[in-house]
Amino acid sequence: TWWPVRFAAQLTVVLGAGSLRVQLVVHNTGNTDDGAWDFTTALHTYLRVEDVGRAQLGGLDGCARWDALADARGFQQGPVMFLGEYDRVFSAPAGAIHLHDGALGLQISQSASLSNTVVWNPGGALCARLADLPPDGYRSMLCVEAALIDRPITLTPGQQWQGWQELRVLPAP
């Protein structure tokens, strides 16, 4: 699809020792006659896990959440666990999120400019219908996306916005 506004977007990926940082910069390159425009975004981070049924996400306890499957709002209580299809949008926590899947740990941080965290796993039934995943692919993947969904950003000509997500491998316990 064509987006009828003047803009520049730059995605930077930085690999470090045990870390990965993804940064997105969006710039309204229009002139004053073009005016402002709004946008939302998400850094779609697909993570490999050993077994999603044993995976847990910590750090979202107490965060407001919207369950996209049930169209229900509430607050997260305890760690996030995965027992089937999962699609929720959280208010991003002030601190880092921790993913544990048995053997491996991952610390997930994001900039305050990305005010949401999307957590998604297709579960077995949906995964079987997806062309880009094997039928049992849901068992070894999890999306933890730094996002900006609830409050779109408005950029006037000349303004820019940036957001980032960083993944850091945690030492074995």
Regions found by a protein language model. Name each.
Residues Q23-V25, G58, S109, E145:
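Beta-strand residues in well-ordered beta-sheet regions across diverse protein folds
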Residues T1, A8, R88-P173:
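Beta-strand-rich recognition/accessory modules
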Residues D33-F39, T45-T117:
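Active-site/ligand-binding surface loops and adjacent short beta/alpha elements
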Residues L20-V22, I97:
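Hydrophobic residues embedded in beta-strands of well-ordered beta-sheets
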Residues T1-A17:
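Extended, loop-rich substrate-binding clefts of extracytoplasmic carbohydrate-active enzymes
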Residues L24-D33, V169:
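Asparagine-centered strand-capping/turn motif at beta-strand->loop junctions
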Residues A17-S19, H27-G30, Q159:
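Conserved SET/PR-domain catalytic core that frames the SAM/AdoMet-binding pocket
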